[in-house]
Amino acid sequence: MYQPSRGAARRLGPCLRAYQARPQDQSSPWALPFPPLWPHSTTTTSPSLPLFWSPPPPSPPTRLLPPAPPLPLPQVQALTSPWVVLPPGKGEEGPGPELLSGCLDGLRSLFEGPPCPCPGALIPFQAPGTAHPSPATPSGDPSMEEHLAVMYERLRQELPNLFLHSHDYTLYSSDVEFINEILNMRTKGRTWYILSLTLCRFLAWNYFAQLRLEILQLTRHPENWTLQARWRLVGLPIHLLFLRFYKRDKEELYRTYDAYSTFYLNSNGLICRHRLDKLMPSHSPPEPVKKLLVGALVALGLSEPEPNLHLCSKD
């Protein structure tokens, strides 16, 4: 019988001691069905187990689960990306270039998606009530033609006496808007409109000693439901009257100012907006040149010689 040498026994001693069976393992019914490794081992096979292997009983049929929904685009790109994302601590210390590249690819996919198949179908969102409808509607409405005709006749009678008599404010709606570009002010409401016209009348009568309003042109425009009036304010300033009181003919002292008004009508035929724009002031006619002054200048030789246009001498 083979006897291991002393050196081999010294090296195999721990292994032999490790493979020796414990008493509780020998009494267990689940002993392993293979012969002992060493002749002196007391481990035996369990008689309760069959000598031949039999297949396990069939398991009950399993139901197929529904297919999982497709992954979002960032996850799909992350799975198919050639970069391997290493968690910190398993490889290099801190986030490496692979982790940064994967994060950048995921963020870029959020903003660089596939183009929209129907770009023309996108309509910008508009909150209800934000659109401001224009005061005008289609010009083919016969009722608006009648409203324009009635308002044209009433303004033709009221405007010349605007600064002389009380104005008829029933022509305007309760929420009339007054845009005065001359005084640079804007009001809304009939009460404020009355106060604004009263202020304009007060300023005019404190600047002019004599005043009259001339309507140069009044037109109606059915395409946008407006009436446009060009008028001229003619008056004699008070300061010129005091400075040149000795003059009998005061026609040359009058000053004229042109203005342009646009009246917008609503569906009820009332004026809902009045816009007043300033035009360039008209110049007064030049004063006639006194013949005596011209004669004195000619006599003294101070008048400018007339230009000679005859470039070629007459034969």
UniProtKB/Swiss-Prot annotation:
Pfam families linked: DUF2358
Superkingdom assignment: Eukaryota
Record protein name field: Uncharacterized protein C6orf136 homolog
